[in-house]
From Swiss-Prot:
Domain of life where this protein originates: Bacteria
Protein name: Sec-independent protein translocase protein TatA
One Pfam family here: TatA_B_E
Chain segments annotated as coiled-coil in the UniProt record: none
Gene behind this protein: tatA
GO cellular component: TAT protein transport complex
GO BP field: protein transport by the Tat complex
HAMAP family: TatA_E (MF_00236)
Classification via InterPro entries: TatA/B/E, TatA/E
Primary localization: membrane
Transmembrane segments annotated in the record for this chain: 1-21
Role: Part of the twin-arginine translocation (Tat) system that transports large folded proteins containing a characteristic twin-arginine motif in their signal peptide across membranes. TatA could form the protein-conducting channel of the Tat system.
């Protein structure tokens, strides 16, 4: 039950080519690439303000909580 042999991968590749055809696979890969580019652009847009300057880091406050002594 180890990894697949080369013949297994060739059979899988042949089935994929039969199902999708030669023209459909590059189209699918192009759509995936466009999605990745769009995602990266969206992530980089979150890091900049509308005027193009980087947003300042969020200032967080440290709050110390102490248990009250109940006697």
């Amino acid at each position: 039950m180890g990894s697949f042999s080369m013949w297994h991968w060739l059979i899988v590749l042949a089935i994929v080519l039969l199902l999708f055809g030669r023209g459909k696979i590059p189209e699918l890969m192009g759509d995936v690439a466009k999605g990745i580019k769009s995602f990266k652009k969206g992530m980089s847009d979150d890091d900049t303000a509308p005027d193009g300057t980087p947003k300042p880091a969020d200032q967080s406050k440290t709050v110390d909580h102490r248990a009250d002594d109940h006697k």
